[in-house]
């Protein structure tokens, strides 16, 4: 069995869109039969990103990884995001049935990510369970995923500082 942890993070404002919201996600995978430990992260330079968007990207990596490399193996994906867990275990089924509208008849946010997740979890032989874990409580996998999400934003900041470029005409 594979066990995944995923996390998302933004610098700026939690789930408030803002031009300076640089985001990142992190994910780790553990195996109970071996000492496999895979880490992945990505910074996201899109502006106006949110924590929820980054949380979804981390989850999507876990789903893709499980499907690509362990298609018939049970897995558990842990997230400290109530949004991610509730979406996967409840809301998404209603959204798909209701034309991707929320219970308040509003369009689902992050629709492209949500629909990609739906493609994964609606497969006939879907094999992942998505569970909630407490964030920042010393759970190794969650702490590692959080560190990767945070690290990805710092890498982006460092690259921006190292390669400052002015575009336009010189005076």
Tell where the protein language model's regions lie, with residue ranges.
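RNase H catalytic domain
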Residues: 10-16, 22, 60-144
């Amino acid at each position: 069995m594979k066990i995944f942890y995923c996390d998302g993070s933004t610098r700026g404002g939690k789930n408030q869109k803002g031009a300076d919201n640089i985001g990142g996600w992190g994910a780790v995978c553990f195996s109970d039969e071996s000492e496999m430990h895979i880490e992945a992260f990505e910074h996201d330079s899109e502006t106006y990103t949110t924590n929820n968007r980054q949380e979804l990207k981390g989850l999507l990596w876990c789903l893709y990884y499980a499907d690509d490399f362990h298609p018939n193996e049970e897995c558990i994906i842990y997230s400290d995001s109530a949004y991610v867990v509730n979406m996967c275990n409840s809301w998404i089924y209603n959204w798909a049935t209701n034309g991707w509208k929320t219970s308040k008849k509003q369009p689902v946010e992050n629709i492209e990510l949500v629909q990609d997740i739906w493609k994964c979890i609606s497969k006939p032989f879907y094999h992942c369970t998505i569970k909630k874990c407490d964030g920042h409580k010393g759970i190794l996998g969650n702490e590692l995923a959080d560190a990767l999400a945070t690290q990805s934003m710092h890498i982006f900041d460092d690259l921006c500082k190292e390669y400052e470029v002015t575009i336009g005409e010189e005076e």
